[in-house]
Amino acid sequence: RTRAEAAGVLLAMGVLTLAGYLGLGLFATRLAARGFGPRHMYLAGWALNLAALVAIVLRIPGAPLWWCVYGFGAAANILAFTVLNEGFPSALAGRSNTAVNLTMFAGSFAAQWGIGVLADALRAAMALSTADGLRGAFVTVLVMVAAAFAWFLAGWKRYAAPPAVARA
């Protein structure tokens, strides 16, 4: 890939991420009124991320498309604030939102740094190319994301509140 092609993929991924945010903003209330609440939307976005990451790691043809799907699904991460608040009394909403915000920022930094460190370590230890080192690091990310997804699903019934029905 050339730099221009990579830039085009990043632009498309960014546009689709913004489209995901716009879609959540436009349709979340209507979907909640039909029983598809924030937890469901969060799950759907996470499932898209997971499916796209599997496709990327397995080198399923169409990598630019898979990165765009990944970006679109990532928009649902904003719903972590709403989903987390389902498990706390409303008086603690500020604290839980602050905690998830700090965790997201710190986790994003740690993940980006960790992917680079792991990719470099794999390259050095196994004489891999840069692409193969990154692929190995992304396999680790995939395993961690899949484990977190399974944990989220396991706690679904325990923490899920019925979606609030919007009044028209």
Protein language model annotation of sequence segments:
Residues A76-P89:
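Intracellular juxtamembrane helix-capping segments at the cytosolic ends
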Residues Y21-F36:
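Helix-to-loop junctions at the C-terminal end of transmembrane segments
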Residues R1-L16, D132-V139:
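Loop-to-transmembrane helix entry
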